[in-house]
Regions:
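Active-site-adjacent loop/helix micro-motif of nuclease/hydrolase catalytic cores
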Residues: 78-93, 117
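Active-site metal-binding core of divalent-cation-utilizing nuclease and nuclease-like domains
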Residues: 6, 13-17, 30-72, 85-92, ...
């Protein structure tokens, strides 16, 4: 994604240990320029809610939050940092994107390397291997047209 490429020098995990909100803040202007609605804070009005379930008269009864959402492109972006692999956050992102109404594409941005307690963890490689395993095994069909994993 061009948004992360444009911000690479400011967000690369080789030099920085930004939290996910810090990474999102760096790429938000580029995503917004592409037509994405982007989370700008932690208050309810600043979050991006994507419908999951509806009740009578089309009112949303359940929605999940995303870091960025492009309605016309049917695209959701999630930016993760330290807990992407350690806490299986990327799996939660996958599940929620699969439940979202009218979303065909998911991009998950994770650190290339996450350092915890002095140990380097290859988060990007682990997430990619996980998704490759899902697709290669052909045992689980995901209701998405595409998943993009971006390392930073």
């Amino acid at each position: 994604m061009n948004a992360l490429d444009a911000s690479h020098v400011d967000i690369t995990s080789a030099k920085h240990a930004l939290p996910s909100d810090g990474v999102l803040a760096c790429v938000a202007p580029y995503l917004a320029e592409l037509g994405f609605a982007v989370e700008i804070g932690k208050k309810t009005a600043e979050k991006i809610r994507v419908p999951v379930l509806y009740r009578n008269n089309g009112r949303v009864s359940k929605a999940f939050e995303a870091d960025a959402h492009h309605v016309e492109g049917k695209f959701v972006v999630e930016v993760e940092a330290g807990r992407a692999v350690a806490n299986n956050q990327f799996l939660k992102d996958l599940f929620q994107a699969c439940m979202m109404d009218d979303v065909d594409h998911l991009a998950i941005a994770v650190r290339n390397v996450y350092v915890a307690a002095g140990v380097k963890n290859p988060d990007f490689d682990r997430v990619v291997t996980f998704f490759e395993t899902i697709y290669a095994s052909n045992r689980m069909r995901l209701p998405r047209r595409g998943i993009l994993v971006i390392g930073y």
